[in-house]
């Protein structure tokens, strides 16, 4: 999987040590991608509804976007009937939010809702191989 992710000049960074590298890339106007459908850490991330159930969700994309005025864009590929994949991008608006706990939670809700809408539109194309709801909300 990492070979596939890095074959077009991408770099994969370890999540535990990524903060400095991610901030540096954002400040250099380089794109940064997060796998936002993965479960977060229940001790440092936040719970928001995903597919009707509370799920611990990474807050870092919202925190970085609000702190650095970097856009959040959901990207996904859909297989068309002819077997060709179409890549689609959807920007998540957040001009009305500030970098507060409430603002970060609201932006996280928005990007999770956008992901959920994509999955509901193309459920047969969602490749899901992990426990998204492995932690109970407090």
Positions of the model-derived regions?
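Membrane-interfacial amphipathic helices and adjacent loop/beta segments
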Residues: 1-16
């Amino acid at each position: 999987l990492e070979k596939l992710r890095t074959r077009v000049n991408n770099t994969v960074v370890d999540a535990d040590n990524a903060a400095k590298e991610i901030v540096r890339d954002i400040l250099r106007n380089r794109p940064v991608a997060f796998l936002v459908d993965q479960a977060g850490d229940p001790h440092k991330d936040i719970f928001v509804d995903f597919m009707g159930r509370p799920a611990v969700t990474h807050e870092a994309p919202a925190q970085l976007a609000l702190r650095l005025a970097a856009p959040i864009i959901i990207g996904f590929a859909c297989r068309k009937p002819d077997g060709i994949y179409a890549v689609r991008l959807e920007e998540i608006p957040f001009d009305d939010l500030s970098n507060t706990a409430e603002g970060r939670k609201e932006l996280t809700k928005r990007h999770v809702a956008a992901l959920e809408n994509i999955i509901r539109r193309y459920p047969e194309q969602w490749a899901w191989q992990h426990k998204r709801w492995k932690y109970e909300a407090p």
